[in-house]
A protein has these predicted regions:
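Conserved, mostly hydrophobic/aromatic
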Residues: 59, 81, 103, 135, ...
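Conserved active-site and cofactor/substrate-binding residues in soluble primary-metabolism enzymes
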Residues: 38, 54-61, 83, 149, ...
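Short, ordered loop/turn segments at secondary-structure junctions
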Residues: 104-105, 148, 227, 266, ...
Length: 461
């Protein structure tokens, strides 16, 4: 059920911070965050470590910079898979974005965050019947169909539901062999030819004809997406152009205009100093050229282009704080062991992204300096897990560390905590904090392993 605006605001009220074994008690009201030197320590002492911190001002700045270059025909839907934190989704909704959800849980999150159903699209393969029913009853903007069998299931669900209004849908095209795919775009393959995403042309055309003839379904348009974290504006624009061309061809075949073209996401951010920054101005220029004349063809002046950015908006706005619990020298190399690791931040190990990593110390009372950078040495930064995979950084140039220091890791606002494995080895789960206008608020408390034990049962036999 859709939360009212008041309910959404209430859901974001700060809560008292529990006291898990490795986290300190938090205050519930907003407080100013000092800047620059001791900010990390003040956050760590107030909310405990490990800790995820999201800069809402940075999120807003990235949203505004993207909106500024896009043609008016473009709508933005935040991809919740990047960061489904309720407060983050709510903030992006206040900034004018809709939501791209890929599960019933993400749909519930978007609704609770106050996103209007008319601005939500459900995408993703393997959508269950209960998720389809939730989307139908919620009256969302569109449900993406990825196979003929999914179309048939949705048709039956709508028929049983007895709705008078047809349910809006998008058809997803496979991009495994798309001509815009290039190996030099700096992205990660989503649709890699595995047969999981979208439909081949024959199945897509068949589904289009069936949907057009159905009294239960309303074919809005076409969806295609196959590449993530692209850093080349022309690669992104080529994909959108190919998707628009495919929508025009489909509309001509059906003899009816399409009202929505969904180009997916894929806007990337650089991980590490050697990666380029996405040229937003170039991307916007290409998009304006692509949509300039489509109202003269089988698309109409009312046709919208939907993009689903996620990582680009929130990735650089997040940082992860963990405390140094031990130091040692192994084979002549300094090693730092933290109270957090890949159970909270798996992506650096999973895909090899090079996140910025810094050692933070309290400002020295004696000399007034913060974070003495003299004599850095290649250092291994590891977590507390009993696996050799739990390494967050290798050969990181850092000065000598001491227990109690902090390590800060940047660019973790997307695909951070929720993509990791927080239950492995039963360590406490980190809290999440939002910072805006110099004030920090708890948006999700840390969770103690005891909470996981409370929902488990020992069988009677």
């Amino acid at each position: 059920m859709t939360a009212t605006e008041a309910e959404a605001e209430a859901a974001l009220e700060p809560q008292p911070q529990p006291q898990p074994q490795s986290q300190s008690q938090s205050q519930s009201q907003s407080q100013a965050v000092p800047d620059p030197g001791d900010a990390a320590f003040d956050l760590a002492e107030r909310f405990g470590t490990p800790l995820f911190v999201y800069d809402f001002d940075a999120i807003e700045a990235r949203v505004r910079s993207l909106q500024a270059v896009l043609p008016p025909v473009v709508d933005l839907a935040f991809a919740l898979k990047a960061n489904p934190a309720l407060a983050v989704v709510h903030w992006l909704g206040r900034l004018g974005l809709g939501a791209d959800v890929a599960s019933g849980g993400e749909l519930a999150t978007a609704l609770r965050a106050g996103i209007a159903p008319a601005r939500i699209v459900l995408t993703g393969p393997g959508t269950r019947d209960d998720e389809l029913r939730l989307a139908v009853s919620g009256g969302i903007r569109a449900i993406t169909i990825e196979s003929p069998s999914a179309l048939d299931r949705l048709e039956r669900i709508v028929a049983v539901d007895g709705r008078r209004e047809p349910v809006p849908i998008l058809l997803r095209a496979s991009t495994a062999a798309a001509p815009w795919r290039r190996d030099d775009g700096g992205g990660l393959a989503i649709d890699d030819g595995s047969g999981k995403f979208g439909m081949d042309p024959d199945d897509l055309r068949m589904c289009a004809r069936l949907a057009t003839a159905s009294s239960h379904l309303d074919l809005l348009g076409l969806h295609a997406f196959g590449w993530s974290n692209v850093l080349d504006a022309d690669v992104l624009a080529d994909h959108v152009e190919t998707t628009v061309d495919a929508a025009i061809e489909l509309a001509r075949m059906l003899g009816t205009p399409l009202r929505l073209v969904d180009g997916g996401g894929g806007l990337g951010i650089p991980y590490g100093p050697t990666e380029p920054t996405l040229d937003l101005a170039r991307f916007g220029e290409r998009l304006r050229g692509i949509v300039a004349g489509w109202a003269d063809g089988p698309l109409t002046r009312d046709t919208r282009l939907l993009l689903e950015p996620g990582r680009y908006l929130v990735g650089p706005a997040g940082r992860y704080l963990a405390r140094v619990v031990d130091t040692k020298t192994l084979a002549g190399r300094p090693t730092i062991v933290l109270d957090g690791g890949i159970h909270h931040l798996l992506r650096p190990t999973l895909v090899g992204h090079e996140h910025g990593l810094w050692l933070r110390r309290r400002r020295s009372v004696d000399d007034g300096r913060f974070h003495d950078r003299r004599d850095p040495r290649p250092t291994t930064v590891a977590g507390p897990l009993c696996t050799g995979l739990d390494v967050l950084g290798r050969d990181v140039p850092l000065p000598a560390a001491s227990p109690g220091d902090l390590v800060e890791i940047g660019d973790v606002g997307a695909y951070g905590f929720t993509e990791s494995m927080p239950l492995f080895l039963s360590h406490p789960m980190p809290a999440e904090v939002a910072v805006r206008d110099g004030c920090a608020e708890l948006i999700r408390p840390g969770l103690d392993p005891e909470s996981w034990l409370e929902v488990q049962r020992i069988p009677s036999w």
